Swiss-Prot record:
The lineage of its organism: Bacteria, Bacillati, Cyanobacteriota, Cyanophyceae, Synechococcales. Catalyzes the attachment of threonine to tRNA(Thr) in a two-step reaction: L-threonine is first activated by ATP to form Thr-AMP and then transferred to the acceptor end of tRNA(Thr). Also edits incorrectly charged L-seryl-tRNA(Thr). This is Threonine--tRNA ligase. Belongs to the class-II aminoacyl-tRNA synthetase family. It comes from Prochlorococcus marinus (strain MIT 9313). One of its GO terms (cellular component) is cytosol.
Length: 640
């Protein structure tokens, strides 16, 4: 009979198989009432699942992240229940959990309107009040197919048909509504209290533009009303910080239908880009990287050798010329190997660090494109390090230092780190995987860094470390990565002469800090709400006069500041000074210089900031010292 080990170290013995709910009941009525699911030997299960052997059990409630995920998954099914009651002809597709919420894809002849969304949410609340039990039934593939044939649910039937014969299928019954899922789900709708339906959008079935366009209903759910309110507040703030909205206000960039997923950089946006690029260029030079440049268009044969053609050809833009097929590069790595392969390399030459601001194109689905955050044409701060196995840990350690140096310069101090290890399908021996994974984990541990392990999440060709930034709204953005690669150097014939005079294949480390320039600029704009640190601001100073008499003095000051390489503009419009100050403040210009008769006579400048701080009058040299001090801080002064 099972002995149940609890998280606090206590053990309970039962005379017969016991469910998770029965374990919770044995610990107290309060826990039983709050129980949503359970982890049995690390596996998340429904509360009704029997435990037949000795196990470690953790009861999951709404206070746990697993509990929130279970609640959100159950809410997706509740959408299905409500929609089928209100719109019986609707056909249900899939309803997964996503970050901060859930959605359900539905086929229905008529577009759901905002009023429909309100009606669905109202019906969901009515169903929640019924406090009905959610029943689980384990069925065969044949039984599941018959169930959904009876209910005329073609999308469910398609999913069932793709499930392996011996795999367990679970049906979840919400009164008259039945859905299919791996689970777990809440045992009763009393756990489904705090939620809100957010929006409706279009989504192709299976993400394939050749298939049916479905309607996707998004929702969010939380463990308490306080958490829901806080989330909605964050959404409201995120809406204000939307980089597309701010870019329009500041004239940074635009996109248009004639070039989907391609960025039209305006002068001010391009100024930000150039500052970013120059900073990364100078930083990489200090860390002994060689900057290179490789072709945009490369013959198909190279992509076949590298393995990209087989895996990514549908995402590549191709063209033909003189009976040859070419691809616009979706990534830079195969081309970097070509540069490494030029000339004989010795172990004494390693490590070799090749960096490129590589422009890539990927044929992303049009529906996924989103401003700077998801584009088709992007530039990576890409680099590849060719080294020996023994050099991997040292190179990873140096890269970690570089990553944190760069992120601090942009004002990001909260960095989350994940180490992804070997998947089931992989190349390379277990011995080399052991060495590589140990090199990565030892490099992280030597820095005293906290990191999460993601078993089985590495690429087939090697383990990797991912670096994610947390912005001022608590959102997490995966940016940096360093990836060990055993495969590509060998596939593309890279070699060096080792100390024993034998030819060896180098290890290749793929690494990026920003990810892509476009996306990183989008992150910066939203993190700072457009009020970029002074060193990044597209215009650092605007000089403006109070009257026409001050025009020449304004122009002289602008020329002096521009000669010192400060990004400066002059505003000589015949407008009131208050109007001009307000306009440039809304444009997020860090420093405003005002010249009136008094300043013109004294040779000083009146200075104020976009935050409204008034420094009064000072000599121009005093102002440039102030400016230099602010620029030197980079992003370390924080979010204003």
């Amino acid at each position: 009979m099972p002995i149940i080990a609890l998280p606090d170290g206590n053990k309970k013995k039962f005379d017969q198989p016991v469910t998770i709910m029965e374990v919770a009941e044995s610990l107290g009525p309060g826990l039983a009432k709050a129980a949503i699911a359970g982890r049995v030997n690390g596996v998340l299960l429904d509360t009704c699942i029997p435990i037949e052997k000795d196990s470690e059990v953790n009861i999951i409630t709404a206070k746990d992240q697993d509990g929130i995920e279970t609640i959100r998954h159950s809410f997706a099914h509740l959408i299905g229940h409500a929609v089928k009651q209100l719109y019986p002809e609707a056909k249900m597709a899939i309803g997964p959990v996503i970050e901060d919420g859930f959605y359900y894809d539905i086929a229905y002849d008529h577009p759901f309107t905002p009023k429909d969304l309100e009606a669905i949410e109202a019906r969901m609340k009515e169903l929640v009040k019924l406090d009905y039990d959610v029943n689980v039934e384990i069925v065969s593939k044949e039984e599941a197919r018959k169930e959904f044939e009876k209910r005329c649910e073609p999308y469910k039937i398609e999913i069932v048909d793709e499930i392996p014969e011996n795999e367990i299928i679970k049906l979840y019954r919400h009164q008259e509504y039945t859905d299919m899922c791996r689970g777990p789900h809440v045992p009763n709708t009393r756990h489904l209290r705090t939620f809100k339906l957010m929006k409706v959008s279009g989504a192709y079935w299976r993400g394939d533009s050749n298939k049916t366009m479905l309607q996707r209903i998004y929702g969010t759910a939380w463990g308490s009303s306080k958490e829901l309110k806080a989330y909605l507040k964050r959404l409201e703030e995120a809406e204000k910080r939307d980089h597309r909205r701010i870019a329009k206000q500041m004239s940074l960039f635009h996109t248009q239908e004639e070039a989907p997923g391609m960025i039209f950089w305006h002068a001010k946006g391009w100024a930000i880009y150039q500052v970013l690029e120059q900073y990364i260029r100078e930083t990489l030079s200090l860390h002994d990287y060689q900057e290179i440049r490789t072709p945009q268009v490369v013959d198909r044969s190279l992509w076949e050798k590298s393995g990209h053609w087989e895996k990514f050809k549908d995402d590549m833009f191709t063209t033909t010329s003189e009976n040859r097929e070419y691809a616009i590069k979706p990534m830079n790595c195969p081309c970097h190997v070509q540069i490494f392969n030029q000339g004989l390399k010795s172990y004494r030459d390693l490590p070799i660090r090749l960096a490129e601001f590589g422009s890539c194109l990927r044929n992303e689905p049009s529906g996924s494109l989103h401003g700077l955050m998801r584009v088709r044409n992007f530039v990576q701060d890409d680099a590849h390090i060719f080294c020996t196995e023994l050099q991997v840990q040292e190179e990873v350690s140096k890269f970690i230092d570089l990553v944190f140096e760069v992120y601090r310069s942009f004002g990001f101090d909260s960095v989350l780190i994940k180490l992804s290890t070997r998947p089931e399908k992989r190349v390379g021996s277990d011995e080399i995987w052991d060495k590589s994974e140990k090199a990565l984990s030892d490099a992280l541990d030597a820095k005293g860094l906290a990191w999460d392990l993601l078993p089985g999440e590495g690429a087939f060709y090697g383990p990797k470390i991912e670096f994610s930034l947390k912005d001022c709204l608590g959102r997490v953005w995966q940016c940096g990565t360093i990836q060990v690669d055993f495969s590509m150097p060998e596939r593309l014939g890279a070699s060096y002469v080792a100390e024993d005079s034998q030819r060896r294949t180098p290890v290749m480390l793929h690494r990026a800090i920003l990810g892509s320039f476009e996306r990183f600029i989008g992150i910066l704009i939203e993190h700072y709400a457009g009020r970029l640190p002074i060193w990044l601001a597209p215009v650092q100073v605007v000089v403006m006069g109070i009257t026409d008499r001050n025009a020449q003095a304004c122009q002289d000051i602008c020329k002096k500041l521009s000669a010192l390489e400060y990004r400066t503009e002059v505003d000589l419009r015949n407008e009131k000074i208050g109007f001009k100050v307000r306009e440039h403040t809304l444009q997020r210009v860090p420093f405003l210089i005002i010249i009136g008769d008094k300043e013109q006579q004294s040779g000083e400048v009146a200075v104020r900031t976009r935050e409204g701080k008034d420094f009064g009058s000072m000599p121009l040299k005093g102002f440039t010292s102030l400016l230099d001090e602010a620029i030197a801080l980079k992003g370390r002064s924080g979010v204003s």
